[in-house]
């Protein structure tokens, strides 16, 4: 399956062939030849949207295949048009990139690791393995918003193994095989499978 969200997180519509469709506990389970729907994972919620005339209500990855949960069936072999709920996706991209910026700055300054985070409609929560005073958070907020104002490029690459072994990065160092590294210059270098904005300015604002 071609995971189009790794080609570009800004793909909003696509066409693909229906490979399988079966009824399950959460509705119909559909796999495609390619998809731009991001499956829940790495702290980021799943995309929603439309496949043809059926609604995609959830997306998960199983055994390397992205499974789309829908409210109706689609014929196997049919070409179908997918449309991402872009407002939802872009908010997740802003939140995820903002979380990287904050987590990276806190790791740099205090050595604390992000041990969990949750993206919500109105707020994002991040858990660290250390205590931060309010003044510390205000300093991080100021630094993060300064870097947002700089509109820094955010990159996602798959380094070669020798390059990866020599790289200093946050999180998921136990991963083997191809590892995707998301970088914000001066802010964060982290292994991540999620979708991100192209530049820090698109995060908008960090506010504790």
Regions found by a protein language model. Name each.
Residues 1-208:
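A glycine- and charged-residue-rich anion-binding loop/surface
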């Amino acid at each position: 399956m071609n995971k189009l969200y790794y080609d570009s997180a800004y793909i909003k519509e696509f066409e693909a062939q229906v490979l399988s469709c079966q009824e399950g506990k959460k509705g119909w389970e559909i796999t495609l030849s390619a998809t731009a729907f991001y499956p829940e994972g790495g702290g980021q919620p799943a995309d929603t949207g439309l496949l043809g005339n059926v609604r995609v209500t959830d997306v998960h990855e199983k055994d390397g295949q992205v499974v789309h949960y829908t409210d109706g069936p689609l014929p196997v072999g049919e070409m179908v048009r997918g449309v991402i709920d872009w407002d939802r996706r872009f908010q997740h991209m802003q939140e995820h990139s903002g979380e990287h910026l904050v987590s990276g700055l806190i790791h740099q300054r205090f050595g604390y690791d992000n041990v969990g985070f949750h993206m919500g409609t109105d707020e994002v929560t991040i858990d660290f393995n250390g205590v931060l005073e309010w003044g510390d958070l205000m300093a991080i907020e100021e630094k993060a918003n300064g870097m947002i104002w700089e509109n820094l490029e955010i990159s996602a690459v798959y380094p070669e193994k020798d390059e990866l072994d020599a790289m200093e990065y946050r999180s998921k160092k136990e991963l083997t095989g191809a590892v995707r590294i998301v970088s914000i210059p001066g802010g964060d270098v982290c292994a991540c499978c999620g979708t991100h904005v192209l530049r820090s300015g698109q995060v908008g604002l960090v506010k504790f």
